[in-house]
Amino acid sequence: DMDLYWADGTTTQTETTPVMLTNAGRSKKKAIVSFVDDDCRSEAYTVLFPLVQELGMPYTVACPAGLMGKTGRMTVEQLQEMARSGVTVACHTMTETDMEQDTPETLEATLQQFEAEMRRWGIRGVRSYAYVNGRYKADCLNTVKKYFDLGLTVEKGINQIPYESCRMKRVEVFPKNKSYTLEDVKAWVDKAVQDGGWLILMTHAWYTTFDAAQLKELVGYIRASGAELMDLYDALDATGNVVEAGDYQKPGADAAEPFFVV
């Protein structure tokens, strides 16, 4: 359970109380951690799913709908089983196409196809798009916003309100090139606990670097840290108190001035 800490030091916890990362400085900043596994390879079902169940933890899988049932991929039935158990689903296009190859029109066609498959499979509530290879283009982001609440990049960082909803940062666990270690990922958790914010961790269960024992260790570390382990969409619903207007990106002196509606 998560309490809000108000200026007078009291806490409140009701069903209608929003859990806010920041509330004009009045509430204690809260650290939230969510996990997303990309690609829906067979290992997401055979290796990751049993761990998710054993640890009783929330997880999201990013699904390339057109590749399900192909060699090395999960089957539709496996995805449905995971969804029934509480695992949530993100879009990873139909066939893992890189957005750099897209126009707004081709992307729209792909996302319509993806939506149709999800409906056909009875999978609801797909509210995010994990960009293939982490790539995205400014001229396609309005199309993303039309279909999804979140666009997930591979840029490292902790997400702070107001969220750049089409450019959500993620930190990879077990990178293929072993460029950093589990201790480095723990340091990101520490930073989230210290500063508040939403840390989205990315895994690829099919990478040879994926380590089940280390994932267990990391989940234990997160739980002991005081950070809240939350499903991607639960975290968004709990903290998404700011509605974006226009296309928001922090860097760039010549960018249009962003504004937000609270």
Model-assigned labels for residue ranges:
Residues 5-27, 54, 59-63, 67-69, ...:
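C-terminal domain-boundary segment and adjacent tail
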Residues 31-33, 53-150, 154-173, 196-205, ...:
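Metal-dependent polysaccharide deacetylase catalytic core of the NodB/CE4 family, i.e.
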Residues 45, 75, 107, 111, ...:
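Aromatic/hydrophobic pocket-lining residues that form the small-molecule binding cavity
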Residues 45-52:
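Histidine-anchored nucleotide/phosphate-binding helix
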Residues 47, 113, 139, 143, ...:
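Alpha-helical elements of Rossmann-like donor-binding domains used by nucleotide-donor carbohydrate transfer enzymes
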